Regions:
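Amphipathic alpha-helical dimerization/coiled-coil segments
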Residues: 2-14, 36, 81-117
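N-terminal helix-turn-helix DNA-binding core of bacterial DNA-binding proteins
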Residues: 14-53, 72-84
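Short beta-strand "wing" residues that participate in macromolecule-binding interfaces
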Residues: 68-69
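Short, hydrophobic-biased segments on the C-terminal half of alpha helices
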Residues: 58-59
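Glycine-centered, phosphate/nucleic-acid-interacting loop/turn motifs that mediate DNA/RNA or nucleotide
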Residues: 65
Length: 117
């Protein structure tokens, strides 16, 4: 019998948990790839780091309500919960993705810091 994978219900998705999950660069990279490519097998992210580290990052994203993991035979498929996130926090995922892409294009790979007036 397959182990059931727990996901928070839409109403249980917490803004602080989502922001904390997306504050880590590896998890942001996973989300950016899912935005670009759609659902993927967890093993498709092997170049992002060791399997134990990736398992931890996948769990943090799932527990925060950012992703959904489903079993397909021996594989785990991961996808973004775009509809749930948009319903709870309209525009949040799009803003985070846009900021992450802008950061990737800036010198040093970090988001530009605006000078205070």
């Amino acid at each position: 019998m397959a182990k059931e994978i727990h996901h928070p219900d839409r109403a249980q998705i917490d803004l602080s948990a989502v922001l904390e999950a997306l504050s880590e660069p590896t998890r942001r990279d996973i989300v950016l790839r899912l935005v670009e490519e759609g659902e993927a097998a967890c093993m498709a992210f092997d170049e992002c780091g060791p399997k134990t580290n990736l398992s931890y990052h996948f769990a943090r994203l799932r527990e925060a309500g950012v992703t959904r993991v489903r079993l397909e035979g021996p594989y785990r498929k991961i996808s973004l919960r775009t509809e749930d996130l948009a319903a709870r926090f309209p525009g949040l995922l799009e803003a985070i993705v846009a900021a992450a892409r802008a950061a990737d294009k800036s010198p040093g790979g970090k988001a530009p810091v605006l000078a205070a007036d």
